[in-house]
């Protein structure tokens, strides 16, 4: 019985809700799914089991939520030793509570990349990574609505984590009770205790085997975490326990000590070069031949005067097989070097593929009562000269089709924010957002929540946006279910973190699912509106995945960090 209970904790589901046989009988299997089911998902033997916070009483407050900051050290090796000692001290002098969460953190004088630290940890699972994008050059509307006067120097640029102090996962759609279960472990007095993770694009859809370990949603507070700041770093260890879940402080400390013994302090700097792999095959779902009729079918519905549909986003899944395995962290590091204006993320539960992304799009950012979102739509390539760049930008700004697509997204987000905010500001009305390979129409929106507990309503109000689903959302979602023959999983879903005083979520586009022996699934989508052309939309899909495919050439190397 003990081993059975352990397996349910591993799956991250309530035993009463979970029925493996029903899941395996119900999903539609793609070629990736069929191949995936024949490959063992237990390659990563060094994984840490902990408690599923969704199974606790979300109404019962924890006994303690605290952060203990130790003295600054010069290196990651010194930080690791300091934490090992601090964890031992915690074991000998335990807090007198039946439940709680304690973060021990050691500042490091050196600035070291969080992604480099994660790559050095030799695939310890679960693992997570979240890197905030640079918003330099854009107005910070959130500042006008947030009461936070603190310095951004105290906010990590990137965060990498291994192990799980506590995780949250279920097959049922993310609910208000699930959100409260997460919030139970967070506090504004411990701002760096955060739950990193994401939600499926469509929580009501059938889960394909490649996505089964992510559940309908998946969040984790890492056991061991490396935070990268503007000029320094920090190593942290977290223990969480709840006797009601049969996960005691002693259990939590023993699990953390086991993980700490595996932590490597020998960190090599990844050169941000293309990977040395060759793509030996590529298969699109849908194929180009099937995609054109799907777009035309959507256009017929949009043109129908009896249909409320004005936009639908049709996605594509591209499976690539390579001559050697793709290292998802090295691939993400390569994407990061040209994606400073984007979020980078990695989520990998035990036994699962790695879901990585380099997304330019923010779903929302909350600081206390202030919340901001943005509209991002329409796509053009970057120009190869200043003259060509200006021509493309002018075409993007004056295109009626692109203006329609963008306006649908912006006005939909404005109306949704109005339902949860006292007032909403839009600035600028329409501009061009330039990324490394593409450019989009862009606008920022911000407002003030009536209360911080409205955070759950931000998610339900804003996701999915017309930029990744369509408008009206429900009509578009139904059409997507009818047309698309693959499981989006967390592609185009909210990816980010919940924190005590601050939360931030990106939209999980420009993303890929990477698994050993199975290559990768690369996802992309385009918005179909009146005036769309199937050939142009297919070319846009190719453009959007180019950042992934073009980064698979040449060889990546390591440089030692002194």
From Swiss-Prot:
SUPFAM superfamilies cross-referenced by the UniProt entry: ADC synthase
Keyword Acetylation: no
UniProt xrefs under Pfam families: Chorismate_bind
Sorted UniProt keywords: Chloroplast, Isomerase, Magnesium, Plant defense, Plastid, Transit peptide
Enzyme Commission code: 5.4.4.2
Changes seen on gene knockout: No visible phenotype; due to the redundancy with ICS1. Mutants are not impaired in salicylic acid accumulation upon induction. Ics1 and ics2 double mutant is seedling lethal due to photosynthetic lesions induced by the lack of phylloquinone.
Transmembrane regions listed in the UniProt entry: none
Gene3D superfamilies attached to this UniProt entry: Anthranilate synthase (3.60.120.10)
Reaction equation(s) it catalyzes: chorismate = isochorismate
Molecular function GO terms recorded: isochorismate synthase activity
InterPro entries recorded: ADC_synthase, Chorismate_C, IsoChor_synthase, MenF-like
Annotated localization: Plastid, Chloroplast
Associated pathway: Siderophore biosynthesis; salicylate biosynthesis
Presence of keyword Membrane: no
An individual GO BP term: phylloquinone biosynthetic process
Transit peptide: 1-55
Cofactor(s) this protein requires: Mg(2+)
Signal peptide range in chain numbering: none
Main EC class the enzyme belongs to: isomerase
Cellular component aspect of the GO annotation: chloroplast; plastid
Function per UniProt: Isochorismate synthase involved in the synthesis of salicylic acid (SA) required for both local and systemic acquired resistance (LAR and SAR) while SA synthesized through the phenylalanine ammonium lyase (PAL) pathway seems to potentiate plant cell death. Also involved in phylloquinone (vitamin K1) synthesis. Has no isochorismate pyruvate lyase (IPL) activity.
Family classification: Belongs to the isochorismate synthase family.
Protein's recorded name: Isochorismate synthase 2, chloroplastic
Originating organism: Arabidopsis thaliana
